[in-house]
């Protein structure tokens, strides 16, 4: 029960971090990583408690999506910092021009 509270608090901290820190792109990426890692840990513990060891492929799929999201986010941040010399989210819409 305590582990469930820890995982839910990690999830809500990541969600609140995304909602409250919308100024810098790097802080949004870090909060999104916290959100997705807590989701991964929750799914892994749920699969362990159900006694079905065949669901580990879904855990690897979620972890792969987290890694892809991180690489795409970091590449967007590098492009943003090279073109506009800042990592502010308000400059992100200017990348399309």
From Swiss-Prot:
Transmembrane feature ranges: 1-21, 25-45, 60-80
Similarity annotation: Belongs to the complex I subunit 4L family.
Superkingdom as given in the UniProt entry: Eukaryota
EC numbers on record: 7.1.1.2
Keyword Transferase belongs to the record: no
InterPro entries: NADH_UbQ_OxRdtase_chain4L/K, NUOK/Mnh_C1-like
Protein keywords: Electron transport, Membrane, Mitochondrion, NAD, Respiratory chain, Translocase, Transmembrane, Transmembrane helix, Transport, Ubiquinone
Listed Gene3D superfamilies: 1.10.287.3510
Catalysis performed (reactions): a ubiquinone + NADH + 5 H(+)(in) = a ubiquinol + NAD(+) + 4 H(+)(out)
One of the record's GO molecular function terms: NADH dehydrogenase (ubiquinone) activity
Any one biological process term the GO annotation gives: ATP synthesis coupled electron transport
Lineage summary: Eukaryota, Metazoa, Echinodermata, Eleutherozoa, Echinozoa
Protein's UniProt name: NADH-ubiquinone oxidoreductase chain 4L
Entry-linked PANTHER family: NADH-UBIQUINONE OXIDOREDUCTASE CHAIN 4L (PTHR11434:SF0), NADH-UBIQUINONE OXIDOREDUCTASE SUBUNIT ND4L (PTHR11434)
Principal location: mitochondrion
Gene: ND4L
GO cellular component: mitochondrial membrane; respiratory chain complex I
Purpose of the protein: Core subunit of the mitochondrial membrane respiratory chain NADH dehydrogenase (Complex I) that is believed to belong to the minimal assembly required for catalysis. Complex I functions in the transfer of electrons from NADH to the respiratory chain. The immediate electron acceptor for the enzyme is believed to be ubiquinone.
Pfam family, one: Oxidored_q2
Localization per record: Mitochondrion membrane
Membrane topology, record value: Multi-pass membrane protein
Annotated organism of origin: Strongylocentrotus purpuratus
Keyword Repeat: no
């Amino acid at each position: 029960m305590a582990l469930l509270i820890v995982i839910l608090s990690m999830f809500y901290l990541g969600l609140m971090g995304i909602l409250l820190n919308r100024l810098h792109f790097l802080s949004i990426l870090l909060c999104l990583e916290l959100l997705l890692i807590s989701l991964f840990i929750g799914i892994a513990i749920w699969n362990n408690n159900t006694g079905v060891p065949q669901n580990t492929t879904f855990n690897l799929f979620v972890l792969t999506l987290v890694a892809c999201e991180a690489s795409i986010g970091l590449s967007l941040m590098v492009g943003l910092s090279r073109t506009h010399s800042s990592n502010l989210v308000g400059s992100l819409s200017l990348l399309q021009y």
